[in-house]
């Protein structure tokens, strides 16, 4: 009997070992392909904004680096006390929400003044800030009521909504149930449910928004909407890569891509989906295996893309139970044509 049990145990052990060899941990495969950088921006990525040639990122702290440059991020010194829960920008001014002991305070910082210090936005009890031109501050009045105020880029009256904002871009604020202008009015023709993300579009008054099945583009100059089916499973975030005329839509396994017809075409009827590793993709053919074995396997939220002087850079907030790998990852073309920790 003991011999039979031993033989059975040995057989099971061999199956487990062989299975492990055939299915190595995803990020173990990464470390076989590239040497991982020491992580600077760890954990949950709460946002990245651009002011001039400088990028600012938050993971509770605020970090900065020159746009397009590889290497470590530097921690911004002299920030207010508390956890930075989000960033927004209007012109040279950086806005941030800080939480301490369940109390939230909004501050702003003039990046154009070398001796600038953080200044509180007084008379405001807001939980979050959003925006890339107009800055929207959000206060929670009850479990079903929120007040939204424009604190930079205009001065319309505050307005109430039953939905917490998804995000903001240009002069628009996105709610789960529709796109609003800076006065709180719903944009005519807006999709009205399940909206997941917003980013700036290719022209000065255009934005992209996304839901579970479609990518939409709103052109404010012509007041027109167009859309295309995107095919991304459980969209999380979107960004526009101007250099390649691509909308990147992050999901639960990497990101999908939509190619515009031209640098200024907002009509998604002329757009098409592209496959990672194809000629139009932001993932070069030579990088497809490393992409598939790394960020292409995991939930990305958020995602950001920026043009550089010679190409482009993509940042992905990787969300994984293994905290060793969660945090901000970057891809630089040229400079670092591989996905690696920031």
Outline where the language-model segments fall.
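Entry beta-strands of beta-propeller and related beta-repeat scaffolds
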Residues: 54-57, 93-96, 134-136, 145-150, ...
